[in-house]
Amino acid sequence: MAKNITVNNVIVQYVFLERVNPVSNKFTFDCLIPQDHPQVAEVMAACSAEWLVVAAGAAETSAQSMGTNWTLPNDTGHIHPDVAPMLDPNLQYLRFRGVQDAAVAPEKATKIYANMQQEDGTIGVGEVTNRSIIGDGTIANVNLNAFGYQASGQKGVKFYGQWIQIVNLVESDYAGAGAPPAVIDNGYVAPAAMFAP
């Protein structure tokens, strides 16, 4: 299970990836922070501010469209069923996410490779697929063509909550395994060399 992942210098307890719509090839990265985390307000403010920058002119202004919402720990419709039992049943969790919608250019969909927990519970290296849990939090290779519309030049390919700065994906249950941590500089993609296969 990916634990203790640093995003915007905030320790995030769990991260998982879900393909929301296999037709449009839309992926969602979900991160959960307990409501009593000292930086919850900071995360919400940063997400809201960057959403307004990334999606300037967008009609949607709800908390969900800004990339955050509050989720109960037993809400397996929004929380991975393998993650839900690990959460504190007495807390709500701030769920924030980045969505890569490759409907405009599905052939350029971001592919993420990581040491991940397979369906049988084993840890293996491969492409992170639908509803997989990122096992050790390391990203080995990302196709940058669709990693946010700044890189692709297509507004149809974007991240909701592009502010998420995955500074260091470290201190996981499988620390030291797999590729070195990936870095996304100031919320945008780092040089492609940093994501060499």
Kindly give the residue locations of the regions a language model identified.
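A short, structural micro-pattern
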Residues: 23-25, 88-90, 138, 153, ...
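A beta-strand/beta-hairpin structural motif
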Residues: 98-128
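Exposed beta-sheet edge/beta-hairpin loop segments within beta-rich domains
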Residues: 116-140, 147-157
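Acidic, gly/ser/pro-rich intrinsically disordered tails
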Residues: 1-5, 170-197
